[in-house]
């Protein structure tokens, strides 16, 4: 789930603005339940190897790993991660085992409500939640699966599969490494554009 704050998009921020955002958001969220029970981190105190380890555990994104000024919170069992200064000001990430997309959505949705009660999200009545990338605007939510595909990768079928899933508005990409042969043969299948939330789907029926 991607959320912007205020009128300045993440990519327009100066280093000074980025530092202020990290401090202000961290200070506002660290006392809020259940975030107060999460593990916190700040890139000011992490070296490159620590960041890489967090990225390999998928508690931070590859994009966040490359930022100079960032912080966040991670649930004790690492099923929920809150990233500050990712592609947008706030990125909420939730995991669930198996194919349980509903559970992952519920975790992310609850955390979105918690943070939304504390911070003022950028929102427009016509366009929904405003984000750095237009493709993320609206609900600001993207659903994805992590897939282990050793047979397809070993038989060089992935490169042919990528354009096929694209016809259905999906993206298939390597979690690590080259798309033709991802490290560990682990791939991510995700929506090209933001998803409608279950709430919106229910209202449209």
Q: How should each PLM-predicted stretch be described?
A:
Residues 115, 143-173:
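Signal/transit-peptide handling
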Residues 107-131:
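Short, hydrophobic/aliphatic alpha-helical segments
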Residues 161-195:
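A structural-propensity feature for long, helix-poor, extended segments
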Residues 17-82, 98, 102-110, 155, ...:
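N-terminal low-complexity, intrinsically disordered segments
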